[in-house]
Amino acid sequence: MAVDKREFVNVFDYEAAAREILPKFAHDYYRSGANDEITLHENHNAYERIKLKPRVLRDISKRDLTTTILGQTVSMPILVAPTAFHCMAHPEGEVATARAAGTAGTIMMLSTLSTSSIEDVMSEATGLVWFQLYVYKDREATLSLVQRAESAGCSAIALTVDAQIWGRRERDIKNHFRLPEGLSIKNLMPAGREQFPKEQADSGLAAYVTWQFDPTLSWKDVEWLCSKAKVPVLLKGVLHPEDARLAIDHGAAGVIVSNHGARQLDTVPATIEALPEIVEAVDGKIEVLIDGGIRRGTDIVKALALGAKAVGVGRPIIWGLAVDGEQGAKRILDILRKDFDLAMRLCGCTSVEEIK
């Protein structure tokens, strides 16, 4: 399908085009949330209920969008959140996404469930890459992933803590979701964990998680990982302030306020609603990031004003990738950067620090 990308002015335009381009099963996988998808809609709608109060008569002719996260400098407080199976959206998959993030001067978080290997992605990456980690029942396999990520040059580990078991994603169940022929979880090859189980009643990914992921994951494992990792470890999937405090106690360098794109437990709070309590709980001791529902520059300003160090963007990157590969993913980051810059100026701010 030919699309005139010159008419695309926001991430929603890319989303609409991707819906027409992607096979239904792939679009449903990327777009869907858990159960009734209440939290899926709330993740963005909650931003609309927060109002900005701008300052006026300030010199906004020069701006600085750069910031530091875990001591790492990025061009803007907008990161690529981890999402699985990029090669379903475009043949170059995660490699194209990494190049786009590098060109934009920001961080890509590479998923464990990547359809490109850590080594292939890092050989093409021109910027910072963090590795998102799921904990497998086989701890040696888990540790091997961490060591490979570190050896390849990943500068942080984002441990997902809200997905020891899989949420009920009804679109995937109806589609009997599985990876298309020729695609696999490249980071687990050739260990026999790179494909979904052959026998499955509904979602192949849900069956894979039950087969491989460790439901006994606990705070002891966080301590274990922090003791083994040579790079900072963040916990991704924190919504409760007490868990944020425990993250500090167990050695985490940061938390990512996330509800897994509303794909795990439906009716949990929108991430922006959970953010203020978590920022208060950590009291500046570790860094706080957020993802979920961010589609506009004003959303980014609101998240930073409420205490987030940076935001992660997931689905929009996939829409850009599906429409135009590396250039589409880069265009999504450009759109968000410009929209954030404009919103920041209209609020009377000239730097990320001023927003806070």
Q: What would you call each of these model-derived segments?
A:
Residues 1-48, 273-290, 294-356:
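Alpha/beta catalytic cores of nucleotide-metabolism and tRNA/nucleoside-modifying enzymes
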Residues 74-118:
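Glycine-rich active-site/cofactor-binding loop and its immediate structural neighborhood
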Residues 127:
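Conserved thiamine diphosphate
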Residues 34-35, 112-116, 137, 239, ...:
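Short beta->alpha linker loops
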Residues 85, 99, 103, 120-124, ...:
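Alpha/beta enzyme core
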Residues 33, 111, 132, 159, ...:
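Active-site-adjacent beta-strand anchor residues
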Residues 51, 66-68, 77-81, 107-111, ...:
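Short, conserved beta-strand segments within well-ordered enzyme catalytic domains
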Residues 1-71, 169, 176-217, 353-355:
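An N-cap/entry alpha-helix motif that binds or orients negatively charged groups
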